[in-house]
Amino acid sequence: ICIINNDVEVTKDWLKPIKERLNNYPNSIIQPKILDLNNANYFEYAGAAGGFIDKYGYPYCRGRIFDTIEKDNNQYADNEIFWSSGACMFLSKKIFIDLGGFDKTFFAHMEEIDFCWRAFNHGYSIYYISSSKVYHQGAATIKLNSSKTYLNYRNSLFMLTKNLPLKSLVNTIIIRLIMDILSSFRFLIRGEVSNFLSIYKAHLDYYINVKKLLSNRNNYINKPNYFKINSIVYKYFILGKKKFFHL
């Protein structure tokens, strides 16, 4: 099956390399190259050339880290990734059903990352195919608002609690709390009071629901090797590493 947003435009023969990969590796989840419909030479914010997360659940992509979006120079080859964008994702119906689909409690934002993390824990592979290309209207054109900020921060905490190895959960959540407090003051300094408050609303909602989240953790193995770098926040904001190949 293909999960695709209604603001995605496909290209000629885009399905051929996807079908070849699925025929050879039916237990794969696949993402094509996602470019910006409004700026066709650049990657698109939501997915780019495939996604990853750091130790604390902050997402980033090959071709896009935070607000730095790279020009597409075919610099990212076919490779295994950690998460596929929900803007365009291919997988078998069996995988989608076996994993229970997207988590409805997320409502919107980060549900595809949670889904791919569950797939990773179950032993499925997520793969990027550069020769399949689509264009997405996308997230970069949507101004950040307090609702989106709330859902992004809340759902990230939900996702961590569902998928982290239990032994590292408490320490990771504590560090995330500290990092999110620092992030909230960044909004406050810029005068974005509603976004500032949304982070605390997200944490409040998380703590209200944490017991339920813990009781609903699945019985599969929660793998510890889900991240490649400890902190994308530190790499990007402190060390100034703005592009994936700098990491």
Describe the residue ranges of each PLM region.
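Short beta-strand-to-loop acidic/aromatic patch adjacent to the donor-nucleotide binding site
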Residues: 1-9
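Short glycine/serine/threonine-enriched helix-capping/active-site loop
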Residues: 3, 29-37, 62, 129, ...
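Conserved donor NDP-sugar-binding/catalytic core segment of glycosyltransferases
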Residues: 8-58
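A recurrent flexible, glycine/aromatic-enriched loop bordering the glycosyltransferase active site
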Residues: 55-61, 66-91, 113-115, 140-144, ...
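Glycine-rich phosphate/pyrophosphate-binding loop
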Residues: 68-81, 214-247
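A short, conserved alpha-helix in the catalytic core of glycosyltransferases
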Residues: 76, 82-133
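Active-site-adjacent helix/loop segment of glycosyltransferases
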Residues: 125-227, 231
